[in-house]
Amino acid sequence: MILLSYLLTYLLCALTCSARAIHNGRSLIPRAGSLEQVTDFGDNPSNVKMYIYVPTNLASNPGIIVAIHYCTGTAQAYYQGSPYAQLAETHGFIVIYPESPYEGTCWDVSSQATLTHNGGGNSNSIANMVTWTTKQYNADSSKVFVTGTSSGAMMTNVMAATYPDLFAAGIAYAGVPAGCFLSTADQPDAWNSTCAQGQSITTPEHWASIAEAMYPDYSGSRPKMQIYHGNVDTTLYPQNYEETCKQWAGVFGYNYDAPESTESNTPEANWSRTTWGPNLQGILAGGVGHNIQIHGDEDMKWFGFTN
């Protein structure tokens, strides 16, 4: 009887432990069709939260879009307020929604840590989310993209500068150049009024050197960039559109003063699209302030999901 009791106890424990292992194993794989948090995606030096949307119509070797929220925003708010999850169901890509760890939920685009490749800041944490997702879902590393609005657009430019090897393209909605919000006190999540008010003005070559210094040993290809901004933005002044386009024109070696083309009323009335080359476009929205509309269908074209 004693032996039988031990055997029954052992079997019960084995079944319970196995069930727990299966449950825990499943918990590591986010459910498709809903926004899910991933708590263990590797090194997370700045405590950024990771949320992910895996579509029910997941492509084999899917693409990835990193969608970065604005100040006061959250992953949930950007998931609900942007078109990327819905577009993921159509095109089969995965969406990563990082969430800022700071009060007010702006992003750290000001410290040396975040402005340095593998420097231990927010950019480092977000890059590790991309690496985890690529491995977990056997994603196509040539189809990884980044976009964001306001503070998220600032981080989009920072990600393109600090991790150019990870991204094929970026789209920044109402941001500033990478490095423009640098804090002289090396404070994360700092506000830079000089930059915000469009007073940080320099040459394309100087802006390019700032971006390139964030990953100084890198000599590979860089993500093509599309820059949106409203021409009556009073939060991040419209001069930041000019300076951001200068920065990427400098990076790509384009003559900022001689764009290839400028199209009026594109992608909508009173908006204009300027193209400097295959790797850089700027869209200036006439009569639009800081709350600029995301153009999901246009984003899909820039990212190569549609023609």
Swiss-Prot record:
Catalytic activity reported: Deacetylation of xylans and xylo-oligosaccharides
Q: What class of enzyme is it?
A: hydrolase
Instruction: Please cite one Gene Ontology biological process associated with this protein.
Output: xylan catabolic process
What keywords are annotated for this sequence in UniProt? Carbohydrate metabolism, Cellulose degradation, Glycoprotein, Hydrolase, Polysaccharide degradation, Secreted, Serine esterase, Signal
Q: Which InterPro entries match?
A: AB_hydrolase_fold, Esterase_phb, Plant_Biomass_Hydrol_Est
Q: Where is the active site?
A: S150 (charge relay system)
Its EC number is 3.1.1.72
Q: Name one GO cellular component term.
A: extracellular region
- What's a single GO MF annotation on this record? acetylxylan esterase activity
> Its pathway?
Glycan degradation; xylan degradation
Residues of the signal sequence? 1-19
**Chief location of this protein?**
secreted
Tell me which residues are glycosylated: N192, N270
Function, as annotated: Acetylxylan esterase involved in the hydrolysis of xylan, a major structural heterogeneous polysaccharide found in plant biomass representing the second most abundant polysaccharide in the biosphere, after cellulose. Degrades acetylated xylans by cleaving acetyl side groups from the hetero-xylan backbone.
UniProt lists the family membership as follows:
Belongs to the carbohydrate esterase 1 (CE1) family. AxeA subfamily.
The protein's name: Probable acetylxylan esterase A
* Organism of derivation: Aspergillus flavus (strain ATCC 200026 / FGSC A1120 / IAM 13836 / NRRL 3357 / JCM 12722 / SRRC 167)
